[in-house]
Amino acid sequence: SFLAKHGWLDLEQYEKKAEDQGSAEHRLLYPLRPLSVSAPSDHKNLLVVVVDSLRADMLNNINMPNLQRYADNHFNFRQHMSGGNDEAMGMFSLFYGLPGHYYGDIRADKRPPVLFDEMLRQDYQFGLFGALEDAKQYRQSLLAGLRKQVFVSRQTDDRRLIDDWQQWLGTRTADRPWFSLVYLSSPGDYQVPASIKGPFQPELTRFNPATAYRPENLQKLENRYKNAVFYTDQLLEQMLTQLQLQGLDDQTIVVVTSNHGQEFNETQSNSWGYGSNYSTYQVQVPLVLAWPGAEPAPQAQASSHLDLVPTLMKNMLGVRNPYRDYSTGRNLFEASTRTWLLAGDQNDFAIYQGNTITQFNKQGDFELLDRDTYRPIKHGTPDMGTLIQVMNELNRFYRAP
């Protein structure tokens, strides 16, 4: 391949060497050093709401008026990318602050995120809401360190899920900080209660994958999605109001984001939904952040799911280590000179830099694409300086073979 030919990249060969050294447990060095922590005397609560398949362009006054109003009064990261283009990579990058390249080894090692470990050490109550626990992938990664029963509700009906969350909020132990993850699935499932007629019409009344993607149904499919998003916006308003009513909004960090985007064939490549390419339609998502005591300011710089963990570890939990000890992200509140963002899984990677997307795989094959059109850039060559930085990030949490 082009990159291997330049003598410094063949991830496959590197991985094979590393595998010969033994199991994931001996390969993975995460975190790189033990954590040094100055825990705060006054703990903030943490609410993370992940809305399945929420496109970045849905955060506006028409599709999500409630969340837009909330975003206007808090931190709204408008150039925000997930760390992947599917559910597993989106959630992994958000809670580990690591590229998806490490996912297989984290799972093999059943290594929980340092964020969760540290919250447990600081006596946070965990309340998780959504249909996550059934997936083996989460039991071997995100949830691996959670011995106690922390799943309060596995409802797939979002309204009931919110009811369960509100009940939990009212009955938890008042003198301990809490962490709550709420996973809302309506947009990804095109789900709207039958009793609700959404404002976007005409819509597909029933989502059938066999017929939904026909050209004549495109507008109806998009409207169905927009109605599910609009419905979700009302549920978010209900949650945020509940925090206020219980007097918790000034003690609670709130994060609203998504696992990945949702494409409606904008790339003209018969791509629908997620997981099929690294266009911004599938990877760019909203990130709205409320942080008690912080003065909101417009957020113009590009940000990534990889940045949430460093921000929470330092500013919420008092971790003193450099971010590089446990993440490839940076603190959202600190100015950055970073010129690129990374998304990907265990095999494929995408670097977002200016108006270019550089995609490459473990074999070292690469392609340059226009960020807006997702069309190949002919005769383009990758930015070698950036690729070397990225390769370092993809390897530095492994022991050298």
Regions found by a protein language model. Give the residues of each.
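A short beta-strand-to-alpha-helix junction
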Residues: 106-113, 219-231, 277-283, 294-310, ...
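Membrane-interface soluble catalytic domains
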Residues: 22-24, 29-39, 134-135, 241-247, ...
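Histidine-centered active-site microenvironments of extracellular/periplasmic hydrolases
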Residues: 244-293
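Structural scaffold positions in well-ordered secondary structure
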Residues: 70, 94, 119, 182, ...
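Soluble extramembrane regions of membrane proteins in the secretory/endomembrane system
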Residues: 232, 253, 259, 347-348
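Extracellular/periplasmic catalytic domains that process cell-envelope and extracellular macromolecules
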Residues: 39-42, 119-121, 172-175, 248-249, ...
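A long, amphipathic alpha-helix that forms part
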Residues: 11, 163-170, 205-252
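Active-site-proximal alpha/beta segments of enzymes that process anionic O-linked groups
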Residues: 1-209, 329
